[in-house]
A protein has these predicted regions:
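Compositionally biased, intrinsically disordered low-complexity regions used as flexible
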Residues: 1, 178, 274, 868-878, ...
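Conserved P-loop NTPase motor core
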Residues: 1-612, 617-631, 684, 705
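Proline-rich low-complexity regions
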Residues: 113, 220, 408, 710, ...
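Short, Lys/Glu-rich amphipathic helical modules
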Residues: 444-457, 691-692, 746-751, 895
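Hydrophobic, well-ordered secondary-structure elements that form the walls
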Residues: 449, 497, 797, 833, ...
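Short Cys/His-rich zinc-binding micro-motifs
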Residues: 886-903, 907
Length: 908
């Protein structure tokens, strides 16, 4: 705590004091609602809605609504919100971030603001990090909402548009951040409003808000289709890159003369970049038989070479990615989980595939994209929950205008956080780590060992096997067992090695997890997985088989809870869960996420980090000075140093990296804000067309503007008729406005004419053609206008996205010309946007004036779509996305990947 906090009290303490009267008002109503019968309590929802309709605000009814929800939770779920959980609910309702420690019941806290805000009828989105949690919480907490008369929806991948539409129409919708974002993008690719699924962005509660809004902020959501580029060049570039010699440096100095460097490319370990040197460029020119790598004609080759050296010099197997079943799969740097379905952009993924000699996929074409930053900033009110947000408080304020309020724990925190032990070498560090693990195992204290990569977790596993210490390894390679391993990490004598924060979201309970043991017992009894899923689910059902399975599961759960209780006492007696960090992460928040796994709900626990000056963080950010100091002091490699100087140095290094990443995320946002403004313009215009606004007037205006623009382009000087290029103007409009004999005048006629006269003649011809088309197609023409306009908007918008990406890729060089790259990107980007708008006008008018009906086809509303290349879901297809898949049968595996049959999952 800083001096200011000691003198004036922390910001969180002051904010909690401010809302205390509201908390007391909620608690004071406990007896009132406890005395209500079920029917009266359930009727409160309708009463609250009537009060809102009569002019009351959500804040006015908050105490009563929270108290009613609190009582209902006790009756339906068997859980009553603690006072600190009521505090958390108020913070979330106010559109802020509530920092709550692990095990404090964030899932239950969200029910209070979700219920209150759902009463407005505008919808509430509860955002989770994965589909399992979304599905679980929608069923579990959904029982509470449904009991109180609200509807609950679930939006996850694999659902049909009709299922999604029903989910978003519900009062409260659960889903993942990815699915909410993708549904937004898909809604802005449809041709008919009936194909849209979302209905607005009123209020979102984001679980693990730091993971979604900070960690994933630099990863845009992209809907893509197959590109047309060949993959051969990736393999050729990789074969060339394999012949090059790299030079690894901690940090590259831009002032260094690269001509003197005797290496082919430089790997900057701090910035994680690879840069080809003049020597490397000369080798490339010789290898590919070109005159200059910097020639504009060789930009594509240069890009492939740059990605190939990045794949070989920067990206490391089993750290940044794994190769599994012939596929390159990204490893999440923050959680250690496999990111199935995600791919690096700009050809980097293909470069890694070429390096690893697996099938190189075609580079995808971006059809629609948005960052999480800009998606979540669309909500009228945004709130979040996490156990670790305070270190990122400034970023939440600057980017999202969210403040972080730290909530106290319901029970006093009994965890002991020991000082870091810093060793001179990694050998000394690992020796100490093995000793600590062995000591914990000997006294049967469970220990969770956190590592920063798959490679390091497997190295520690190998050393433990040599010592004969039984253990479990949890990393991206074994993610299928993640929840099971983490759930049992609190058993006496359990040794669990985990990369980063794998298993986050699964509580580690002292003594073991009774629910997992009960599930395991069901498996041993031969129960099918889908029935086990139903037995442990919370959804309403009348199926007798499922009801019997649930009753049996509850019996087993009761039995194992009784067996685990003395085991939990044993673990508490030896100090609770021991958390051992083997390396400091670049972010203090990730370190804190490891720490908070211990000491849940007042349990004892211990945390300690054992690090060395040879670790990447220390080596790249200030370790040399400390290494020299230790050498001068004659410190042995097996002697730990625990000093404030070292702790300050580590925190300083982390703060510098956090600042660097913050600047990178801000920079991403600066560029995306340019695209976002353009996206808002395009999507708002699209929405007006979808909403049924007549486009005929817009089409006529497009004709007039396009003709006027063309006339001014070809007839530059109003007075100098000799410079008029009437032939060029005629050729440009030939076949859809003009014909061969149009715009041919005698010299005398021409002298009397102005540009407005020419424009008037052309507009008259265009109007004539337009009216003829309306007569030809009859009532169907208005529908054709809509579809043609949307098709051209979508097609050219996709091209524009690609063009903007190319512009961004090269804009950084403007800095060398004393030009702000972001300003240059904004100015040139809007010039390109204007050109795209002109293209939309030309293509739309041209198509509408030349389109012809198919012979013997009655032009019905649905049939107008077919010649215009729209998909079954109503989206315009620029390029083929995928072959249409056959709908799964009821007994087929569900395409969402849950492992259940389709009839038991998304086919319900």
């Amino acid at each position: 705590m800083g001096l200011a906090d000691k003198l004036f009290g922390s910001y969180s303490a002051k904010e909690l004091k401010r809302i205390r009267p509201q908390v007391d008002a909620v608690l004071a109503l406990e007896d009132h609602y406890r005395r209500m019968d079920n029917k009266t309590l359930q009727g409160e929802t309708a009463r609250f809605k009537e009060q809102l309709a009569a002019g009351k605000t959500l804040d006015d009814i908050l105490p009563e609504a929270f108290a009613a929800c609190r009582e209902a939770a006790d009756r339906v779920l068997g859980m009553r919100h603690f006072p600190v959980q009521v505090m958390g609910g108020i913070i979330l309702h106010q559109g802020r971030i509530a920092e709550m420690k692990t095990g404090e019941g964030k899932t239950l806290v969200a029910t209070l603001p979700a219920y209150l805000n759902a009463l407005s009828g505008k919808g509430v989105h509860v955002v989770t990090v994965n589909e399992y949690l979304a599905r679980r919480d929608s069923e579990w907490m959904g029982n509470l909402y449904r009991w109180m008369g609200l509807t609950v929806g679930l939006a996850v991948s694999g659902m049909s548009p009709d299922q999604k539409r029903a989910a978003y129409a519900a009062d409260i919708t659960y889903g993942t951040n990815n699915e909410f974002g993708f549904d937004y993008l898909r809604d802005n690719m449809v041709v008919y409003k009936r194909n849209c699924v979302q209905r607005g962005w009123n209020y979102a509660i984001v679980d693990e808000v730091d993971s979604i809004l900070i960690d994933e902020a630099r990863t845009p959501l992209i809907i893509s289709g197959a590109g047309e580029k060949s993959t051969d060049l990736y393999e050729k570039a990789d074969r060339f890159a394999a012949t090059l010699t790299p030079l690894r440096v901690k940090e590259m100095d831009a002032k260094d003369d690269q001509e003197d460097i005797r290496a082919d490319y430089i790997v900057d370990e701090k910035a994680r970049t690879a840069t080809i040197t003049p020597q490397g460029a000369r080798k490339a020119e010789q290898y590919f038989g070109i005159e200059s790598l910097n020639d504009p004609d060789n930009l594509t080759l240069a890009h492939h070479i740059n990605q190939a050296i990045a794949a070989r010099g920067v990206m490391q197997r089993d750290i940044d990615y794994v190769v599994k079943d012939g596929e390159v799969i990204i490893v999440d740097e923050f959680t250690g989980r496999l990111m199935i379905g995600r791919r690096y952009s700009n050809g980097l993924h293909q470069a890694i595939e070429a390096k690893e000699h697996v099938t190189v996929a075609r580079e995808n074409r971006t059809l629609a994209t948005i960052t999480f930053q800009n998606y979540f900033r669309m909500y009228d009110k945004l709130a979040g929950m996490t156990g670790t947000a305070m270190t990122e408080d400034q970023e939440f304020r600057d980017i999202y205008r969210l403040d972080v309020v730290e909530l106290p724990t319901n029970k006093p925190l009994a965890r002991q956080d020991l000082p870091d032990a810093v060793y001179k070498t990694q050998r000394g560090k690992y020796s100490a780590i093995l000793d600590i693990i062995a000591e914990c195992y000997s006294r049967q204290q469970p220990i969770l060992v956190g590592t920063t990569s798959i490679e390091k977790s497997e190295m520690i596993s190998k050393l433990l096997r040599a010592r004969g210490v039984p253990h479990e390894v949890l990393n991206a390679k074994f993610h299928e067992k993640e929840a099971e391993i983490v759930a049992q990490a609190g058993k006496p004598g359990a040794v669990t090695i985990s990369t980063n924060m794998a298993g986050r979201g699964t509580d580690i309970m002292l003594g073991g997890n009774a629910e997992y043991l009960a599930k395991d017992a069901l498996r041993r009894e031969g129960m099918e997985e889908e029935l086990i899923y139903e037995a442990t689910a919370y959804g309403e059902t009348q199926d007798e088989e499922i009801l019997a399975a649930r009753a049996h599961f509850q019996e087993l759960l009761k039995k194992y809870k009784a067996e685990i209780a003395p085991e939990a006492d044993k673990v508490r007696a030896v100090g609770g869960l021991y958390i051992l960090g083997t390396e400091r992460h670049e972010s203090r928040r990730i370190d804190n996420q490891l720490r908070v796994r211990a000491g849940r709900q007042g349990d004892p626990g211990t945390t300690k980090f054992v690090i060395s000056l040879e670790d990447d963080l220390m080596r790249l950010f200030g370790g040399e000075r400390l290494q020299t100091l230790m050498d001068n002091m004659g410190v042995d490699e097996n002697m730990p140093i625990e000093a404030k100087l070292l702790s300050n140095s580590i925190q300083s290094a982390q703060a510098r990296i956090e600042g660097m990443h913050f600047e990178m995320r801000k920079n991403v946002l600066k560029y995306d804000d340019v695209m976002n403004r353009q996206r808002e313009i395009i999507y708002s215009q699209r929405r007006r067309v979808l909403d049924g606004e007549s486009v005929s007037d817009s089409i006529r205006k497009m004709m007039e503007e396009y003709i006027t623009s063309s006339v001014h382009q070809y007839l530059v000087d109003e007075k100098n008729h000799d410079e008029w290029n009437l032939d060029g103007l005629r050729d440009r409009l030939m076949g859809w406005i003009t014909e061969e004999n149009d715009l041919r005048f005698s010299p005398e006629e021409l002298r009397r004419m102005t540009r407005d006269d020419i424009a008037g003649l052309l507009l008259e011809k265009a109007e004539g053609r337009y009216n003829a088309q309306r007569e030809l197609f009859g009532d169907a023409f208005e529908e054709i206008e809509r579809v043609v306009l949307l098709r051209n908007v979508d097609t050219l918008w996709m091209d524009h996205i690609d063009a903007m990406e190319e512009l961004k890729r090269g804009i950084g060089l403007r800095g060398y010309a004393q030009q702000d790259p972001v300003v240059a990107y904004r100015l040139e980007g809007f010039e390109m946007f204007d050109q795209m708008i002109e293209g939309i006008k030309e293509n739309t008018v041209r198509m509408l004036l030349t389109i012809r009906p198919r012979p013997q086809v009655e032009m019905k509303r649905e049939q107008t779509m077919k010649p215009l290349a729209t998909g079954e879901d109503g989206t315009v297809k620029k390029v083929p996305m995928k072959a249409d898949k056959k709908k799964p049968g009821r007994n087929d595996p569900c395409p969402c990947g849950s492992g259940l049959k389709y009839k038991k999952c998304c086919g319900k």
